[in-house]
């Protein structure tokens, strides 16, 4: 049976992740409060931000920026977009 969580982003019960994506309390929080759908969408958005903004994951400031954007994205707040990106119409 699929594990469900009350997703922080979508405010509804959705299938959860199979395991925490990070070690420690942050990973446990995501595991318990973020759906697989929201996490998959974040990973795509994260890749777009890294590529479009040319973020260097060796740079502490770039990692801090990405961490803050992840919090915003997964909480349903307004978050940074890649410059010139237009969301596809559903």
Swiss-Prot record:
Known role = Could be a mediator in iron transactions between iron acquisition and iron-requiring processes, such as synthesis and/or repair of Fe-S clusters in biosynthetic enzymes.
* Family (UniProt): Belongs to the Fe(2+)-trafficking protein family.
Sequence intervals crossing the membrane: none
What are the entry keywords? Iron
Would you tell me the protein name for this molecule? Probable Fe(2+)-trafficking protein
PANTHER family linked: FE(2+)-TRAFFICKING PROTEIN-RELATED (PTHR36965:SF1)
Q: List the top taxonomic levels of the source.
A: Bacteria, Pseudomonadati, Pseudomonadota, Gammaproteobacteria, Pseudomonadales
Write down any Gene Ontology CC term.
cytosol
GO BP term, example: cellular response to oxidative stress
Q: Name one GO molecular function term.
A: iron ion binding
């Amino acid at each position: 049976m699929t594990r469900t969580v009350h997703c922080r982003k979508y405010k509804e019960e959705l299938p959860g992740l199979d395991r925490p994506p990070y070690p420690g309390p942050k990973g446990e929080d995501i595991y318990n409060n973020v759906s697989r759908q929201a996490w998959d969408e974040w990973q795509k958005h994260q890749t777009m931000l890294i590529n479009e903004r040319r973020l260097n994951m060796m740079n502490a400031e770039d990692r801090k920026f990405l961490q803050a954007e992840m919090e915003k994205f997964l909480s349903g707040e307004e978050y940074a977009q890649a410059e010139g990106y237009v969301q596809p119409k559903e």
